[in-house]
UniProtKB/Swiss-Prot annotation:
The keyword Cell wall biogenesis/degradation does not apply. The active site is at residue 175. This is Galactokinase. Substrate binds at residues 34-37, 225. It is an enzyme of class 2 (transferase). It comes from Clostridium acetobutylicum (strain ATCC 824 / DSM 792 / JCM 1419 / IAM 19013 / LMG 5710 / NBRC 13948 / NRRL B-527 / VKM B-1787 / 2291 / W).
Length: 389
């Protein structure tokens, strides 16, 4: 618990008193099922042992004082519960504001302020959901602090709403759901249209999940994420003229092939094809994992990346370089981009004995080609967000 002692010292230095409670919210990695969540499809994410810590103490007034060790230079960000508007100078604390504002709108009134210290071990902008981790962390803190008695699925939904309506990023439910509902050593098969979910045990004996970060600067809100979403919505509208469906995730591959010529724009056709095929790939991948067939699972991961590169066009030279170098390496059974894309991370399944060699070799070759180093994390699968003292 050394990290908690370190954070306690920081809390005392900044707020001149002890914290009352400490919470942890994981990051997440999606093993397969990318850009399917807002298309009514399935995703297969898991929560990680890296994440965000939150130390908190209540106040008697209506002020919130927030400090992040990851944004030291911004100091303490102070705002009033009477003025929960998004503003640029409040930077990362807008995520906290957004969750409070959304709780209020749902009738869970937050009437007291608090002091909060955040520390995240998830690299910002890595695509491992540092923003959703902060949102869910804020949600469970509010739930505990004000004894609101809200179940985790409702917290998750409100956190997604905060990101959509307050922050302005049109994300699906996957990030917040996997962070709130994660389970140690399991991945979650989530149907994003119904929120039905089931856990699959990850039997990784002899293998490791290795995440490689491109370290490319990226911003989700101003990336092409919203553009992809509207392209899929436009394709869906055309398909709805001939078939009674609510989302692309309802179509099988065969149904899509039969109907695809209805989509007049070739770009929108490619976007829709990815959404349909990726959803089916995800379902096949879960079956293979449940049968302990890691080889097929890896093959489907590779196919997922190709589709994200060619049909969805969200990869870029950095992610493509990491994946192609991974697939040339010994002991790798699957590799793909994970997250929204446009930078961020890849996830690879690597034989344990080859992990060091994998990292050294890719680091050197990527740096030579791209001009700066990637970072690597060997991750374990964790429980969802929770109070830890």
């Amino acid at each position: 618990m050394d990290i908690i002692n370190m954070l306690d010292e920081k809390f005392k230095n900044i707020f001149k008193r002890h914290y009352e409670n400490v919470f942890f919210s994981p990051g997440r990695v999606n093993l397969i099922g990318e850009h399917t969540d807002y298309n009514g499809g399935h995703v297969f994410p898991c929560a990680l042992t890296i994440g965000t810590y939150g130390l908190v103490a209540r106040r008697n007034d209506n002020k919130v004082l927030a400090y992040s060790l990851n944004f030291d230079n911004l100091g303490v960000i102070e705002f009033s519960l009477d003025d929960l508007k998004k503003c640029k100078k409040d930077d990362w604390a807008n995520y906290v504001k957004g969750v409070i504002d959304t709780f209020n709108k749902h009738g869970h009134n937050i009437e007291n302020g608090f002091e909060i210290l955040f520390y995240g071990s998830i690299p910002n902008g890595s695509g491992l959901s540092s923003s959703a981790s902060i949102e869910v962390l804020t949600g469970i803190i509010l739930n505990d602090l004000f004894k609101l008695n809200i179940n985790m699925v409702e917290i998750v939904k409100m956190c997604q709403e905060a990101e959509n309506s307050f922050i302005g990023v049109n994300c699906g439910i996957m990030d917040q759901f996997s962070i709130g509902m994660g389970k140690k050593d399991c991945a979650i098969l989530l149907d994003c249209s119904t929120l039905e979910y089931s856990y699959s045990k990850l039997n990784m004996t002899g293998y490791k999940i290795v995440i490689a970060n491109t370290n490319k600067k990226r911003g989700l809100a101003d990336s092409k994420y919203n553009e992809r979403r509207s392209e899929c919505e436009a394709a869906l509208k055309e398909l709805q003229k001939v078939k009674n469906i609510n989302s692309l995730g309802e179509l099988t591959e065969a149904e899509f092939e039969e109907l695809k010529d209805i989509i007049s724009d070739p770009v929108k056709l490619r976007r829709a094809r990815h959404a349909v095929y990726e959803n089916q790939r995800t379902l096949k991948a879960v079956v293979s994992l449940n049968n302990n067939d890691l080889k097929t699972f890896g093959k489907l991961m590779n196919e997922s990346h190709i589709s994200l590169r060619d049909d969805y066009e969200v990869t870029g030279i950095e992610l493509d370089t990491l994946v192609s170098l991974a697939l040339e390496s010994k002991g790798v059974i699957g590799s793909r981009m994970t997250g929204a894309g446009f930078g961020g991370c890849t996830v690879s399944i690597v034989k344990e004995d080859y992990v060091d060699e994998f990292i050294e070799s890719i680091k050197a070759k990527y740096t030579e080609k791209i001009g700066y180093e990637p970072s690597f994390y060997i991750v374990n699968i964790a429980d969802g967000a929770k109070k830890i003292n």
